[in-house]
């Protein structure tokens, strides 16, 4: 498997924690210069201090102007070769109780956040000899789950964007793909487990089992497994892989 080209610059949105931080760390180990972008300065600075990234910029992915400014600042340090559009949030509720504001939150962060990052990074990336865009979607972008209709709709939109944009860019050296993790052992899923416990009275093991039962391997995915897939897609040997939505879910979907 071919690795990364020499010292590419990678920018990871939502890179201060969870899957995003793991991806950033793996990219650093593979020889990339890594900038993490997110809302919380403390988490971003901690990633830099821990060696999981080299630089950190603060921006809310729902704010197009802020994202554009942050990505321009990062590109001024070194042109961006790799964009990992990872930032996301999840909320659950029955459809009847999912109001318009909830749908807007899910779309604004999980879909428009991806759009904003790509629109800011792509123009200069297209002119470079190598470019990789990877969106972190979800198995909820490939199938439905009860009680997360807003989240699932947003993640389906990400997969549709990836498939369409890959065709537009097929003549360039830029590939566009999505990774679609199943339930992953992160603080985001820990929050979902807490929510299940609160609403159902189940203990932590039972609540975690409610999520891991979707995985044919009977477990939660690890952030490292997602990061390994992203790293493969960023490699020079993956130049023919574009427009794909790759499930990292132990056989689910």
Positions of PLM-derived features:
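Conserved glycine-rich cofactor-binding loop
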Residues: 16-17
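Active-site helix of classical SDR
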Residues: 118, 154, 162
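Residue(s) in the substrate-gating loop at a strand-loop-helix junction
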Residues: 138
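Substrate-binding pocket helix/loop in short-chain dehydrogenase/reductase
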Residues: 94-95, 99-107, 211
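Short, small/polar-rich loop/turn modules that mediate ligand/substrate recognition or access, typified
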Residues: 170, 175, 241-243
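C-terminal substrate-recognition "lid" of short-chain dehydrogenase/reductases
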Residues: 217-248
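Alpha-helical segment proximal to the catalytic Tyr-Lys
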Residues: 123, 167-168, 239
């Amino acid at each position: 498997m071919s690795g990364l080209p020499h010292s590419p610059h990678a920018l990871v949105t939502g890179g201060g924690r969870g899957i995003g931080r793991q991806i950033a760390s793996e990219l650093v180990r593979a020889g990339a210069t890594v900038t993490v972008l997110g809302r919380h300065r403390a988490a971003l600075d901690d990633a830099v201090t821990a060696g999981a990234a080299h630089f950190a910029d603060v921006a809310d992915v729902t704010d197009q102007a802020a994202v554009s400014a942050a990505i321009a600042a990062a590109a001024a340090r070194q042109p961006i070769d790799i964009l990992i559009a990872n930032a996301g949030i999840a909320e659950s509720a029955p459809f009847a109780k999912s109001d318009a504001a909830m749908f807007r939150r899910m779309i604004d962060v999980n879909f428009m956040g991806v759009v904003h990052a790509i629109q800011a990074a792509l123009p200069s990336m297209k002119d470079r000899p190598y470019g990789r865009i990877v969106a972190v979607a979800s198995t909820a972008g490939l199938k439905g789950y009860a009680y997360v209709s807003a989240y699932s709709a947003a993640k389906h939109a990400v997969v549709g964007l990836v498939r369409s944009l890959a065709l537009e860019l097929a003549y360039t050296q830029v590939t566009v793909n999505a990774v679609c993790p199943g339930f992953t052992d992160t603080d985001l899923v820990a929050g979902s487990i807490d929510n299940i416990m609160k609403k159902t009275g189940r203990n932590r093991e039972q609540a975690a089992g409610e999520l891991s039962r979707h995985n044919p391997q009977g477990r939660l995915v690890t952030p490292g497994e997602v990061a390994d897939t992203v790293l493969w897609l960023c490699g020079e040997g993956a130049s023919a892989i574009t427009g794909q939505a790759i499930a990292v879910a132990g056989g689910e979907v």
